[in-house]
């Protein structure tokens, strides 16, 4: 009988495929891998890799929530300019990662992109947060940067303040440990 298709699942599949179809028809992009999703057999979409020459390409600036990644190859001589471009390209910032061996490149990327994603990884895969151990949920227009169950989510709903009560009133205004005479 097969999988029963729910309307929202088909909508998601159609949305993902619209990005892939857009890339297939664009002179600024090439589908390097995958790119298929046969509606007649279900809502499965193949993992897809798109390469673009336009850093503002649709699949670079919008969240897809599907098995699609878009690659933009930058000029090594324009590394710092490319980092700035990455920081301002999209209003979304769920998860991000950089891979590098050069300490200067890592430090520069970290300092430029430190607020670009809810979870930011250096030389590690961006697979998501450890549940209830680190905040997760994105930044910018991606989520709330915390999830229920974690301590930072609790802090989100609090208004911390400090209250001090002195039980032994001071007898002088000086500081004896400063050696005042």
What are these regions, as identified by a protein language model?
Residues 4, 32-34, 166:
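Short, hydrophobic secondary-structure boundary micro-motifs
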Residues 37, 44-181:
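Conserved C-terminal structural/oligomerization subdomain of aldehyde/semialdehyde dehydrogenase
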Residues 29-43:
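Conserved PLP cofactor-binding pocket of PLP-dependent enzymes
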Residues 1-7, 11-12:
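Single conserved hydrophobic/aromatic residue that forms the stacking wall/gate
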């Amino acid at each position: 009988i097969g999988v029963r298709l729910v309307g929202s699942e088909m909508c998601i599949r159609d949305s993902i495929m619209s990005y892939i179809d857009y890339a297939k028809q664009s002179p600024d992009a090439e589908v390097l891998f995958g790119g298929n999703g046969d509606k007649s057999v279900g809502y499965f979409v193949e993992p897809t890799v798109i390469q673009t020459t336009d850093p503002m390409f649709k699949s670079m600036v919008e969240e897809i929530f599907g098995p699609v990644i878009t690659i933009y190859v930058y000029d090594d001589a324009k590394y710092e300019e490319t980092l700035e471009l990455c920081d301002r390209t999209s209003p979304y910032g769920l998860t991000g990662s950089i891979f590098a061996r050069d300490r200067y490149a890592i430090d520069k990327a970290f300092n430029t992109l430190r607020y670009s994603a809810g979870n930011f990884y250096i030389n590690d895969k961006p697979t998501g947060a450890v549940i209830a151990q680190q905040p997760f949920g994105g930044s910018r227009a991606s989520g709330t940067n915390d999830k229920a169950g974690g301590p930072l989510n609790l802090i989100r709903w609090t208004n911390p303040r400090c209250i001090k009560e002195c039980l032994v009133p001071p007898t002088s205004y000086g500081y004896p440990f400063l050696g005042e005479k």
